[in-house]
A protein has these predicted regions:
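Structural signature of alpha-solenoid helical repeat scaffolds
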Residues: 29, 74-77
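C-terminal effector-binding regulatory domain of bacterial HTH transcription factors
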Residues: 98-129
Length: 129
């Protein structure tokens, strides 16, 4: 929500840069490159908020995500869907549509949490809280 309300043209350019490279990384199956671009995208979105607390939270979350990347738990077949979702988030922010941006980001986060739970269940055989 804050990203859509506060994003400047310069902020949007920083969000669009990794987003523009994500489709090629997804298409060619370059998982590490895609995940690095994903981290850059989310950091740029956090910077759009101009809220240091949210930026710091994103930095901390990036550290956790990097651990997941090293474990290789992102399936290649999810990348194309991810590109589309990220593009929708960017478009909502660029339109300064805070309601859509917040809804899309919440759905994105919820999807990530559900995916992580499924991975944990598949790897450890029990449902995670």
């Amino acid at each position: 929500e804050l990203a859509a309300l506060n994003a400047t043209a310069e902020d949007l350019a920083q969000v669009k840069l990794p987003l523009s490279k994500m489709p090629e990384a997804a298409r060619t199956g370059k998982l590490r490159q895609y995940n690095e671009l994903d981290l850059q995208f989310h950091y740029a979105v956090a910077k759009c908020t101009h809220n240091q607390i949210l930026i710091t939270i994103q930095e901390l979350l990036s550290d956790l995500v990097e651990g997941s990347i090293r474990m290789g738990i992102t399936p290649l077949n999810a990348l194309e869907h991810s590109v589309i979702f990220h593009r929708k988030i960017y478009e909502a922010i660029a339109k300064h549509d805070s309601v859509s941006a917040a809804g899309l980001m919440n759905a994105h986060i919820e999807g990530g949490v559900n995916y992580a739970k499924n991975i944990m269940q598949d790897n450890y055989g029990k449902e995670q809280p």
